[in-house]
A protein has these predicted regions:
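Glycine-rich flexible loops
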Residues: 1-206
Length: 206
């Protein structure tokens, strides 16, 4: 359990570095946030920050529902984070990354299949958000709608959005989403279009 805001931000930074090292995002792409549990305060990466160079000073402090003025310039995707926190009171962390295989499969019209128990347990289902301009109200609103039913969503021709009760779970889901996409791609290369994790088996392990 995280006892302080500083511990939450430190966890966010660690998992952001891992996300870059894993190839889930490059350069200044992506944005992440963490909410202080039980409050309307959250911290989101500032505009233009690189996720592998984050420090505690790389975050803007926000309040859910705030539209400005801001003490620091938040990521251009702050509306997406804000809308999801408003929609999901159980969510304390949001990762918006750019997993290339997941985005590619979606763009080509292929459904991402689950092959492992972790995929089925932690990802469970994947929402799809049609393309909308970066930072737009339309993107934020549709992402929040998808997150009413899913913990992971593909943002068409853009990236993914994953949520969790803490940064570790939000990152885990993003990583597993891309793993499932890569395995789907490999299966397709081998000519397989049907194999997937047995339906309902994950309930035994929940």
């Amino acid at each position: 359990l995280y006892k302080t805001t500083e511990e939450l931000v430190d966890s966010l930074i660690r998992h952001a570095h891992t996300a870059v090292a894993s190839g889930l995002v490059l350069g200044s792409g992506g944005n992440i946030s963490v909410r202080t549990p039980g409050s309307d305060e959250y911290f989101i990466t500032k505009s233009g920050t690189w996720l592998d160079e984050l420090t505690p000073a790389s975050f803007a402090r926000m309040k859910i529902g705030q539209t400005g003025p801001f003490d620091s310039r938040p990521s251009s995707e702050w509306k997406l984070h804000d809308r999801i926190y408003r929609t999901r009171s159980d969510v304390n962390s949001i990762f918006h990354l750019h997993p290339q295989t997941a985005v590619l499969l979606n763009a080509l019209g292929y459904e991402i299949r689950f092959f492992t128990l972790d995929d089925a347990l932690y990802v469970k289902s994947v929402g799809v958000v049609p393309y909308h301009p970066n930072g737009s109200d339309e993107l934020a609103d549709e992402a929040a709608r998808q997150m009413e039913k899913h913990n992971c969503a593909i943002l068409a021709h853009h990236g993914c959005c994953t949520v969790g009760e803490d940064p570790e779970m939000a990152f885990r889901r993003a990583s597993l989403l891309e793993q499932a996409a890569q395995n789907t791609y490999r299966a397709m290369l081998l000519g397989d279009k049907e194999t997937a994790f047995p339906e309902g088996v994950e309930l035994i392990h929940a």
